[in-house]
Amino acid sequence: MWIKELQLRNFRNYGTVDTEFSPGLNVFIGNNAQGKTNFLEAIYFLALTRSHRTRTDKELIQFSKNNLQLIGKLNRISGALSLELQLSDKGRITKINALKQARLSDYIGTMMVVLFAPEDLQLIKGAPSLRRKFIDIDLGQIKPIYLSDLSNYNYVLKQRNTYLKTISTINSDFLSVLDEQLADYGSKVIKHRIDFIGELTREANKHHEAISNGLESLIITYESSVTQQDHQTIKEAFLLNLQKNRQRDIFKKNTSIGPHRDDIHFFINDMNANFASQGQHRSLILSLKMAEVSLMKEMTGDNPILLLDDVMSELDNTRQIKLLETVINENVQTFITTTSLDHLLHLPDKIKTFHVNQGTLKAD
């Protein structure tokens, strides 16, 4: 898939912008703080209805305005369509072909994106919540049912935690009902994640071995409080663990186990990647991003759109070649932000460049 045209209204430092893109490489050039990253953020926000930079939606709306609108014209394997996202103090409105979407799971995944930004290095050493978010974003785009299962799980989890916090005398029967629901939805979430991590490891290791000239292997593991593989046995083990931890949960007034506390770990040549070098970290994340692209194509039949936010200058000659070979050979529409073309050493002849200056966009 590729985005042919994008219209921005009141997004960050952009007032009104209408522009068309190349189905191949699109490069945004400009000094810092001019709006290059904002433009990639707009594409990301249109795809996922959330920003990768802030949790405060109000920050996305241009100063002194009270709403924003994004409209994208998308070409997919299945045909052309339009996406629209409106944001105001009343909330979000999402539309596909001008038809309002009632559920996020009906909208997310229509346009798939993979973002590669400098902060992705935090995936290795950062908090577990970052790695769970990484899984949720990928799976949410690939499998709409995952978003539904995750939403249901989070709803029951919130109910259970609220009950534990506010009720002085616990009704064991009612808590058992919540436990049953939590285990049902939670086991589905865990099963989705286990399957996905298995596929991700396969693809990421393939790319990592190529980047390291066969010297390194990459393994990704999913760490859960439940280790079984199929939905039913996961559910049974989940319920058993909830029962074992019930008194602890009542005392601490929260739910101590479940996919909301799970984590993933990375190993290079069987060594925890936390102890790897900075160069190895870059190779790992690059392998991960290329694996995301490969998996989305494999599991949906269509390419995602790749957003490279100020990362090319962080990659050496070998890594740049590997990344650009992948996106060019696989016909992946790619957006790159940079302050200069000088360190983009291996760009093909046919690229579309945009010069960004104080919220204005000029195509060459």
Swiss-Prot record:
- Please give the superkingdom of this protein's source: Bacteria
InterPro entries documented for this protein: DNA-binding_RecF, DNA-binding_RecF_CS, P-loop_NTPase, RecF/RecN/SMC_N, RecF_2
Give Gene Ontology CC terms: cytoplasm
Any Gene Ontology biological process: DNA replication
List ligand-binding residues for ATP: 30-37
The answer, when asked if Glycoprotein is one of the entry's keywords, is: no
Extract the GO molecular function terms from the UniProt entry.
ATP binding; single-stranded DNA binding
Q: Which UniProt keywords apply?
A: ATP-binding, Cytoplasm, DNA damage, DNA repair, DNA replication, DNA-binding, Nucleotide-binding, SOS response
Principal subcellular localisation of the protein:
cytoplasm
Q: Where in the cell is it found?
A: Cytoplasm
The protein's matches in Gene3D superfamilies, at most eight in alphabetical order, are given as:
P-loop containing nucleotide triphosphate hydrolases, RecF/RecN/SMC, N-terminal domain
Q: Which family does it belong to?
A: Belongs to the RecF family.
Role this protein plays: The RecF protein is involved in DNA metabolism; it is required for DNA replication and normal SOS inducibility. RecF binds preferentially to single-stranded, linear DNA. It also seems to bind ATP.
Q: What is this protein called?
A: DNA replication and repair protein RecF
Tell me which species this is from: Streptococcus uberis (strain ATCC BAA-854 / 0140J)
The gene it comes from is: recF
